[in-house]
Amino acid sequence: MAQTTLSHPTAPVSLEAAPALPTKRDALLSLGARCSLPVILLLAVGFVAPLIAIFAYSFAKPRTFEVFRSFTLVNYAEIFNGSNTVWLSFLWSLGFAFATCALLAVIAYPIAYGLNRVFGKWSSLVSILFVFPLFVSENVRLYGWVLFFIKNGVLDGTLKMLGFEGGPQILFQPPMILAGMLYVYLPFMLFPMTLGLAMVPRDLIDAARDLGANRWQIWREVEVPLAMPGILIGMLLTFVLGIGAVAEAKILGGQSVIVISHDIEIAFTYSQNWPLGSALAVVVTIFIGALTLAVFSRLDLDRLLGRR
């Protein structure tokens, strides 16, 4: 009996090699990596290198420039000395920064809400009005405040000319410093907050309203949580700028308040004590860096940048 064999068709075998997996070298030579090289170089030269230099100087002997010939903790010991007034300056800076954040959050929120929901076609014009002062030097704007509020200045002279006793003497006092910081840093709180509110879908607000939520519940449970990334970024920017503010304290406050940035400036210039100034800068940088990491750990940057 003849045996029959069944032959099964076989698929043609491709002789082409499978595409190789991308290697680290390919990743380094990718278009995105090449395009980011100028930014990386700029950050390395303009940001990382100065930080390393400041950190190295903080361990040098006081009033010397011998960075690599000596190592001492005297500068940090002087900072953490209980009798050092630098902590009072640091507390003033913290107080101004926190007060600026809190007040600007209250001031900027209605404006940001108006830019998103109320102003309509006028939103661009209103935004330009807030951006335009940034094209003028901060010192010029603050000296304009001095000319306006100083004794026999614009306000005081005008009131006397009209027969009144004159304007209030509010210049060179802490409240005036805070007012100047509110004026200068308002855009840095406003625009991130506007971006955060723009991320709130109108459908969710309409759905919450249809389900019986009142205006307070919608604001508390829908708008604020979804807009929180933009609000936190605005508060972080304002706080970092506020804790490093020196022009407002010097121009609007005179010598009534000494902030930490002023102490650092004096150490580097008048006292010529670069190691102490570097140690102060390192302490402030570590504090701001820790705060920044804490804030960014609560942010969804992918959602904020529109990636998902």
Could you describe each region identified by the protein language model?
Residues 2-16, 194-205, 209, 278-308:
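C-terminal transmembrane helix and the adjacent membrane-cytosol boundary/short C-terminal tail
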Residues 19-33:
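Cytosolic juxtamembrane amphipathic/interface segments immediately preceding
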Residues 31-64, 79-198, 222-246, 253, ...:
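Membrane-water interface segments at the C-terminal ends of transmembrane alpha-helices
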Residues 64-70, 147, 246-274, 308:
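Glycine-rich helix-loop "coupling/hinge" segments at transmembrane-helix boundaries
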Residues 165, 213-215:
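Short coil/turn motifs that cap or connect alpha-helices
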Residues 211-212, 225:
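Glycine/proline-centered hinge or cleavage motifs at structural transition points of membrane proteins
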